[in-house]
Amino acid sequence: MSANQGASGTASDVAGNTASASVTGIDIDQTPPTVTYAGNAGSYTVDENVDITCSAADNLSGVASNTCSDVHAPAYVFPLGTNTLSASATDVAGNTGSASASFTVIVTGASLCNLSTRFSATPQLAHALCVKVEDIDSAPTPGARAGRIGAFIHEVDAQTGKNLSAEEAAILIALANAL
């Protein structure tokens, strides 16, 4: 901000009258607004919720517009790996500020078990799926691991439309394949 600036001017009318004026103490906003993300845990397993808020502030001329958007969603709706949120804000003086926040979504055996339990219509299915996930985590070889992932997927396929919706089944299968 440029503080305590001044301006002066003179005006004349058609009759030849003139007047002058000076003004001091003018503050010129040259500071961009701030964009802030809060609540970011940085890393989320697929069974957790992502709750990140975005805010824009400008203490000088005020915020004219911003692209902030809060995120309140289950982690499994985001792609696995790094996800980045970005927002910008423009103040009344035309200055622009921006920020971004990144977070990572991962799948683990425990998080896939928890999500399977959440999606399952029966406790028996939840238990069966969790046992299969535990078997994946304890597989002694890559071949055994692939076979156990296949057994989990087969069980999910068998329960699709019965004790799991097609959408839930697709999510569980994609996550199992990512283990």
What name fits each language-model region?
Residues 1-28, 40-47, 59-96, 101, ...:
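Serine/threonine-rich, repeat-prone extracellular segments and beta-strand-based repeat modules
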Residues 47-48, 82-85, 95, 100-179:
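Soluble extracellular-acting proteins and domains
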Residues 52-56:
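Aromatic/hydrophobic beta-strand junction motif of beta-rich domains
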Residues 30, 58, 105-107:
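Non-catalytic surface loops within mature trypsin-like serine protease
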Residues 32-34:
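Proline-centered linker/hinge motifs at extracellular inter-domain junctions
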